[in-house]
Amino acid sequence: RQMCIRDRLYALRAMGHGDDLIIADTNFPSDSVARETVLGEVLRIDASAAEVVRAVLSLYPIDTFVEDAAARMEVVGAPNEILPVMQEVQTEVSAVNGPAAMMPIERYAFYARAKQAYAVIQTGERRFYGCFALRKGVVPPDQE
């Protein structure tokens, strides 16, 4: 499945070190939030949150200079609960970034962070709380 076509690739390439990318489920107010981001429009990829995260992380690393580079929206009323969608994304993050847990972020704080992001990708993820923030790290030079 080809998930990263031209406009998605442009956004990922245009992002710099420290820029946030929001991976959102179908219930997240992606369009209205995306209007306040640097890109200014929502990107859509009809795949699960974990599939989109895997595709993104094949193109750029997560920031290693901050603790909240990989974050997830907390479950309202149960901030420490880890739902299956969160575990699936955690598995993808851990595969490239090591075993550090994603930082939980309260729902409205997550919305605020999302509005400051470079871009929002709305996925086809229909499970609740399938919303994540990934802060772009430093892309190393090619091996010589």
Placement of each model-derived feature along the sequence:
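Short, conserved beta-strand segments within well-ordered enzyme catalytic domains
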Residues: 21-22, 120
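Short, small-residue-biased leader/transition segments that mark boundaries at the very start
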Residues: 1-5
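Conserved mixed alpha/beta catalytic, RNA-binding, or beta-rich assembly cores of soluble enzyme
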Residues: 19, 25-55, 59, 63, ...
